[in-house]
Regions:
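Alpha-helical transmembrane segments of multi-pass membrane proteins
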Residues: 83, 113-126, 152-169, 326-339, ...
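Membrane-interfacial loop-to-helix junctions in multi-pass transporters
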Residues: 74-80, 104-122, 148-158, 227-235, ...
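Core transmembrane alpha-helical segments of multi-pass membrane transporters/permeases
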Residues: 38-46, 50-55, 64-98, 113, ...
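Juxtamembrane and boundary regions of transmembrane helices in multi-pass small-molecule transporters
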Residues: 2-3, 164-167, 171-227, 232, ...
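Hydrophobic mid-bilayer segments of alpha-helices in multi-pass membrane transport proteins
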Residues: 7-20, 35-57, 78-86, 117, ...
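Hydrophobic alpha-helical transmembrane segments of multi-pass integral membrane proteins
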Residues: 80-91, 111-143, 318-358, 362-363, ...
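Juxtamembrane helix-boundary/capping and inter-helix hinge elements in multi-pass membrane proteins
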Residues: 57-60, 73-75, 152-156, 181-194, ...
């Protein structure tokens, strides 16, 4: 083990102060809408890397560049970047109308009494298929508002149900950036992480549906929601979902999804060939910031590791958390605290990955379990913070439709993250020997 050096963790502190401090300033002092997401996260990481480069004068600048380059020369990082871009292209191909078709198709099958339960299930399915909780919320929350207006269900309950379903899907999706980051960071297969997560997420989802059902039967129903949909547009999502569950290589699954989506969108006349290429490019470019964050975090962490910062952090963790259960709780708390600070679960996972990997080796925890814990706990915290992208996007969407609702109205109805926390803690406490 290298010499422990807590000062080497200064770049992380600088990043958190910049990102969290400016976010609070913009959001709560200057009252800028979605202030946290107006903070340029890439600039914050560049400043943090500059601080890291100014540390440890005994190492020449050229050597520091070489250390950062070695940190990037990792198969998992390259794989992560390529999957990000390919997943973005897939989402660009299938577009908004396909996700809406999924929602309206399922709403058409179920009586109005169960509309909120359907919203939760629809959000689960769409988020698994799209791989983005924010994208799912953007698409489904306006439908949730329509359900609330037509049926008499409370708007906070409808929004909370959609947000819960979106986080369920984001946690399990094979093309979610959090799944990609966790699996590639820990070196495990996505199907193995899916199986680990599924048995934690399913009980939480079932309990959420039970509570939603109880609340639904206490509500007087006034009407229902109906809208045209194109069933054929659901097919690419089905290919991606079942291909991932079957354990087919993620690149093959995404290419099948892109090809099937291209054929269907062109055959139905929903998209012109030129627009299709533009949409693919837009989808891929939408992942550029996430890719750059992964690159910058890898470079920064390489310097921190070289200086002995991670050894100091790990030493403190080892003194506090003992045994496999302690190690799993330590990982969950670590990624959760980073998520609270950054309000971005992908960034939290990317930053926690190298530390969690060393913890896993120390406590003899399998890569699939480590990836599952990182993804699940980041999902829990991200799904409950009132300044997260999911909450802000949901509120913005309903405000545009003329509804007045605050984060604190919605928080009591974020049932899924609450039950997921309970389910995760139970999973940690009854952990088996071969995790």
């Amino acid at each position: 083990m290298k010499k422990q050096n807590p000062i080497a963790l200064l770049p992380i502190a600088v990043f958190l102060v910049l990102y969290l401090g400016l976010g609070i300033l913009f959001e709560y002092v200057m009252k800028i809408p979605m202030g946290f997401y107006n903070v340029p996260i890439i600039i914050a990481f560049l400043v943090a890397i500059l601080v890291a480069c100014l540390q440890n004068r005994s190492v020449k600048f050229d050597q520091k560049l070489e250390i950062m380059a070695q940190g990037l020369a990792d198969k998992n990082i390259i794989t992560m970047l390529l999957i990000f871009l390919t997943a973005g292209a897939f989402v660009g191909v299938v577009g908004r109308s396909s996700a809406e078709s999924v929602a309206y198709f399922m709403l058409s099958l179920i009586p109005a009494r169960f509309a909120v339960m359907v919203l939760f299930v629809v959000a689960c399915f769409v988020s698994i298929a799209m791989g983005t909780s924010v994208g799912t919320i953007t698409l489904i929350v306006p439908i949730a508002a329509a359900v609330s207006d037509a049926s008499g269900f409370g708007l906070p309950l409808c929004i909370g149900s959609v947000m819960g379903g979106a986080m369920f899907g984001d946690n399990l999706s094979f093309i979610s950036d959090t799944t990609i980051a966790a699996c590639n960071g820990q070196g495990c297969q996505m199907k193995d992480k899916f199986r680990e997560n599924f048995f934690i997420a399913l009980p939480a989802a079932v309990m959420t549906l039970v509570v939603i059902a109880i609340l639904s039967f206490r509500t007087d129903i006034a009407g229902t929601v109906s809208q045209e949909y194109h069933l054929l547009q659901i097919v690419p999502y089905i290919f991606v979902l079942f291909g991932g569950i079957a354990g087919i290589n993620v690149f093959v699954v995404l290419i099948i999804g892109i090809i099937s989506g291209t054929v269907i969108m062109l055959a139905t006349g929903n998209t012109a060939p030129y627009d299709l290429l533009t949409n693919m490019g837009s989808g891929a470019s939408g992942m550029f910031e996430t890719c750059m964050v992964a690159v910058l975090v890898a470079a920064m962490c390489a310097l921190i590791r070289e200086y002995g910062g991670f050894d100091a952090l790990l030493s403190g963790i080892y003194r506090t958390f003992r045994g496999k259960r302690g190690g799993l709780l330590g990982m969950g708390l670590l990624v959760g605290l980073i998520d609270i600070a950054t309000a971005n679960n992908t960034v939290a996972i990317v930053m926690a990955n190298p530390i969690a990997k060393e913890m896993a080796q120390k406590y003899d925890i399998t890569p699939r379990k480590t990836a599952s814990i990182l993804d699940t706990f980041s999902c829990i915290f991200q799904g409950m913070i009132p300044y997260g992208a999911q909450m802000l996007v949901a509120i913005s969407a309903v405000h545009e439709l003329g509804h007045d609702v605050s984060a604190f109205n919605i928080l009591p109805y974020l049932l899924y993250p609450m039950f997921l926390l309970v389910s995760s803690l139970v999973a940690v406490l009854v952990v088996e020997k071969d995790v």
